[in-house]
Amino acid sequence: MAKVYYNGDVNEQVLEGKTVAIVGYGSQGHAHAQNLRESGVDVIIGLRPGKSWDKATEDGFSVYSVREASAKADIIMILSPDEHQPAIYKESIEPELTAGKALVFAHGFNIHFNQIVPPEHVDVFLAAPKGPGHLVRRTYTEGAGVPALIAVYQDATGQAKDIALAYAKQIGAARAGVLETTFKEETETDLFGEQAVLCGGTSALVKAGFETLVEAGYQPEIAYFECLHELKLIVDLMYEGGLEYMRYSISDTAQWGDFQAGPRIVTDETKAAMKEILSDIQKGKFAKGWILENKLNRPEYNAINEAEKNHPLEVVGRELREMMPFVKASKSKGVVANAKN
């Protein structure tokens, strides 16, 4: 079982006299920066010129170029998207990594897959809230917090874990609980969850269900409601109380159908495919493919993305959502991983 730390387990004094630079001011960046500041930490922001720079300035932060912020800071938290981090690091952060500084991540991808290789004289650790930035911020203001993961990759000062815990506490996470992990575990399980269950698995299941009903002659609007729209109702129940609470809350007919049909959908072959997906992640095959795809300017990614936008499920969904003004689509990118970024 994971080791869990709470407020009373943390020595926040290790942050005294230190300046934290938050690189990025998106979903996670604004939450980390504001929570740290309100916890008494000296925070600056590192950005490129643009809307985020203006927003951070409006919020009362001192904003600098990434390189200047990295030079001024003792602790540098990188909250830009995974695919942008290596270039930002190489150009603007690495030259300013003097001995004793700390490099921090909210997702382990670039460290675990060697896209960023820090010098030996700096601490490297993970501080990853398990929720989107707006929730990290809101729960903090309410006196609560979102659980977070910490992991130490490199301990040059002998204080990396203490600093990681203090950072997590000052963004509110130790109010809920901070779980200790490793960069390997966080990275591989995060990618697997996204691919096999949360994004890849769920998207494929929803599309297959929709297509099955439409091909059998049912109206696409009805198929959309049954296979996509109502998914939120079930996921919310799982979120609140696990599978047991979901099953308690649905009808007995639905629960019996769950027991009878579920194993016919997710079969031994499905689990074998999941193991292959996990193996590809563990061996670095997925990472290599994604890195290459980005270097080539994402030809396959963009082609698939455009095709998916025109799937009949999406076409009918856009029409039906016009009937439901209470359904609002957030335009924030990276809500799941980079809940996380």
From Swiss-Prot:
Binding-site positions, Mg(2+) 2: 190, 226, 230
InterPro entries from the UniProt entry: 6-PGluconate_DH-like_C_sf, KARI, KARI_C, KARI_N, KARI_prok, NAD(P)-bd_dom_sf
A single MF term (Gene Ontology): NADP binding
Residues holding Mg(2+) 1: 190, 194
Superkingdom of origin: Bacteria
Enzyme class: oxidoreductase
Catalytic activity: (2R)-2,3-dihydroxy-3-methylbutanoate + NADP(+) = (2S)-2-acetolactate + NADPH + H(+); (2R,3R)-2,3-dihydroxy-3-methylpentanoate + NADP(+) = (S)-2-ethyl-2-hydroxy-3-oxobutanoate + NADPH + H(+)
Xref: SUPFAM superfamilies: 6-phosphogluconate dehydrogenase C-terminal domain-like (SSF48179), NAD(P)-binding Rossmann-fold domains (SSF51735)
Keyword entries, A-Z: Amino-acid biosynthesis, Branched-chain amino acid biosynthesis, Magnesium, Metal-binding, NADP, Oxidoreductase
Cofactor annotation: Mg(2+)
Amino-acid positions noted as binding substrate in the UniProt annotation, renumbered to this chain: 251
Binding residue positions for NADP(+): 25-28, 48, 52, 82-85, 133
Domain KARI C-terminal knotted: 182-327
Residues at the catalytic site: 107
Function: Involved in the biosynthesis of branched-chain amino acids (BCAA). Catalyzes an alkyl-migration followed by a ketol-acid reduction of (S)-2-acetolactate (S2AL) to yield (R)-2,3-dihydroxy-isovalerate. In the isomerase reaction, S2AL is rearranged via a Mg-dependent methyl migration to produce 3-hydroxy-3-methyl-2-ketobutyrate (HMKB). In the reductase reaction, this 2-ketoacid undergoes a metal-dependent reduction by NADPH to yield (R)-2,3-dihydroxy-isovalerate.
Family to which the UniProt record says this protein belongs: Belongs to the ketol-acid reductoisomerase family.
UniProt-recorded name of the protein: Ketol-acid reductoisomerase (NADP(+))
Higher taxonomy: Bacteria, Bacillati, Bacillota, Bacilli, Bacillales
